[in-house]
Amino acid sequence: MQIKDIVKKVKQIEIRTRKKTEATLMGQYHSAFKGQGMTFSEVRPYQFGDEIRRIDWNKTARFREPFVKVMEEERELTMMLLVDISASMDYGTKTQLKREYVAEIAASLGFSAAGNNDKVGLILFADKVYKVIPPQKGRKHILSIISTILTADYVPAVSKIDKAMEYMMGIFKRKSLVFLFSDFEDEYDSKMLRVASKKHQLLGMRIFDEKDNEIPDVGYTLLYDAETGQQVWANTSSARWRYTFAEAQKQKLRALEEDFANSSASFMNINTGSDYSKLLYNYFQKK
């Protein structure tokens, strides 16, 4: 992608996602995610009905009249976007690639966070962590994240989700909102999901193209795994073969859903042709 094409694409995503964000998601996001507790705001004279435990005894003694501490919700949060950049994510049979779809969802989440003055960071991973953008605030930062997702070099390697999670937990000690984007084509250590969800608020997003789950009838054809480089001939005209493939994909999805449920983490299965804003809205409502 040339620079002018990147700029154009980022701008298009910003226009589309900000409209969706402002119309539906931002309010739900604010309501759904609570901050890290209460923080001190100011001291003022005591008023009837104020809680006794809020009295500032030092200032009360000094001025010989009661003063109370005013507390406010500490709203600032950190959102981390973990994006799989293995080669299978650079694929799509619809109007956009999986990576482009991820960039749109990331933009919606990012602008929702920015609207609430929260920080957003990015980790790109495949077989290892390839890039980290530390959490920051603001529109320009979100646009930089979108551009990074769109222009990343997608890696012909098996994705190691558990390594990315372990890395994230090693550098972010404070509870964060963690959104994990992948097609989950490769194996991972489910124990890491449980460890991560105990500390962070975790949502896994399986991004898939409708052709990921089915193989068309095109006779004998050479199937190629973009991540491992393996090739195998298959008779796609065989109804039994196509059925076995489809059932294996369904079983993989069921196991994935169970892993997240058993880890007390949230999970979404999102087709690149679907309206992700409705799914996010429903997710925020349930939090």
PLM regions and their residue ranges:
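Von Willebrand factor
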Residues: 141-176, 188-189, 209
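Short, flexible loop segments at the rims of nucleotide/cofactor-binding pockets, characterized by
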Residues: 58, 154-158, 180-182
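Active-site glycine- and acidic-residue-rich loops that bind
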Residues: 181-188, 202
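Short, internal active-site loops enriched in acidic
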Residues: 126-130, 186, 274-276
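Von Willebrand factor type A / integrin I
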Residues: 1-33, 42, 167-174, 192-287
